[in-house]
């Protein structure tokens, strides 16, 4: 059995949408869904759901919530150069594998 997939985008990263209805908008990643290759980004790709009243949602009605976006449609925004960038990996001197911005070579984490 294979282990968990590794993505260049992780929870709490700031990302920009490259394609789709929210193209050009940016937000913070709330969750990465590894099995479906998707991520949920804060206040992006909003959908409306009609909910019946229930124990958790007493009032019911129309709720707006974030819908998952495919990982390939997102680009990480570098904190230093503030541009959407491709992400690379490199191993530091202390044998720690880190992500880095391919535009400015700044270490991301």
From Swiss-Prot:
GO BP terms: translation
Annotated signal peptide: none
GO cellular component, one term: ribonucleoprotein complex
InterPro entries reported for this sequence: KOW, Rib_uL2_dom2, Ribosomal_uL24, Ribosomal_uL24_CS, Ribosomal_uL24_KOW, Translation_prot_SH3-like_sf
GO molecular function, one term: structural constituent of ribosome
Annotated Pfam families: KOW, ribosomal_L24
Keywords: Ribonucleoprotein, Ribosomal protein, RNA-binding, rRNA-binding
Record-linked Gene3D superfamilies: 2.30.30.30
Subunit structure: Part of the 50S ribosomal subunit.
NCBIfam families named in the record: rplX_bact
Family as reported in the entry's similarity comment: Belongs to the universal ribosomal protein uL24 family.
Free-text function comment from the UniProt entry: One of two assembly initiator proteins, it binds directly to the 5'-end of the 23S rRNA, where it nucleates assembly of the 50S subunit. One of the proteins that surrounds the polypeptide exit tunnel on the outside of the subunit.
Classification via HAMAP family: Ribosomal_uL24_B
Name the record gives this protein: Large ribosomal subunit protein uL24
Organism: Syntrophobacter fumaroxidans (strain DSM 10017 / MPOB)
Recorded name of the encoding gene: rplX
């Amino acid at each position: 059995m294979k282990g968990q997939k590794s993505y260049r985008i992780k929870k709490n990263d700031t990302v920009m949408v490259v394609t789709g209805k929210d193209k050009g908008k940016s937000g913070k990643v709330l969750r990465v869904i590894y099995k479906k290759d998707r991520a949920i980004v804060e206040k992006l790709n909003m959908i409306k759901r009609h909910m019946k009243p229930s124990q958790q949602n007493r009032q019911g009605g129309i709720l707006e919530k974030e819908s998952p976006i495919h990982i390939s449609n997102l680009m990480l925004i570098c904190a230093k150069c503030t541009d959407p960038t491709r992400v690379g990996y490199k191993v530091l001197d202390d044998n720690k594998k880190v992500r880095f911005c391919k535009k400015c070579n700044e270490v991301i984490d």
